[in-house]
Amino acid sequence: MDENCQLIPNQIGDHTILFDRKYLQRGIEIYIQNHDICLNLSLPTSMDEIQLFYYLVKVYCEYMDTNEFVKDDWLMDLKDIDLQMVYDKRTSADALMDLKSKLSDHKYFEIFGILHPISIGENELNDFGTDLDLFGQYLHNQQALDAYYATPRIYNAHGRRIGMYALGANILTILPVEPYVVLNQIEGIEEWYVFMNDSLVKYRDLMSFIKKFDYYDANHRMVCLSKEEISEALNTLAIQEI
């Protein structure tokens, strides 16, 4: 994963994400710690991914020639797996219910998918509720779209910290309604910009200028600008210097 929590395909790092290409959902993290093979399953997730997780547990137990594994500091036996799948299913449904109960205090919640973060709000929770199959299908559909998920780069310019997105012509692009850095890893960003055709516009100005968006999630919209639309935007909004 990169600094924006996006998947870097076909690379193995200290922490690597495993997934079934049929299910673009949350993924299963694998890493080595003190000679132990460690797997991490983020909840809530779908039953497909819960089943895949425990399939991998069985595979690695067989590889290590053992019937035992540790989960949440408890020693488990492979015969406990069916019960653990029921537990994780219930925990996932409860987590979705908990998110819905807390929406009055938050605009949305951000969860981490395999390919990139997804913002879950009222619309999303109304669609899938606590149904894990619907939740899993939602995660897959969002990440299977043939679209560019824009992420920011942060720069220091004249003593100020600025954030910058890139937007190209005729590319379906997913942009945040409110620009941000995932997990607030970098704070104190004074201004946000979009880089187009070797020119800069202020982020908020471009978002006001664009006439048509398609909904993506609670904090993202999809846009596809033609060369002519980008030229029109730059003629009106381009700035000479930061």
Q: Model-found features: residue ranges?
A:
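Short, solvent-exposed loop/turn motifs
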Residues: 25-27, 75, 200
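C-terminal interaction module
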Residues: 108-242
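Short, intrinsically disordered low-complexity segments
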Residues: 3-48
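Mixed-charge (acidic/basic) macromolecular-recognition segments
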Residues: 73-136
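Generic surface-pattern signal
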Residues: 2, 62, 104-105, 140, ...
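Short amphipathic beta-strand/extended segments with alternating polar/hydrophobic composition
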Residues: 28-32, 78-83, 195
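Acidic, low-complexity cytosolic segments
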Residues: 45, 49-74
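Surface-exposed beta-strand edges and flanking loops
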Residues: 19-21, 32-34, 41-43, 70-71, ...
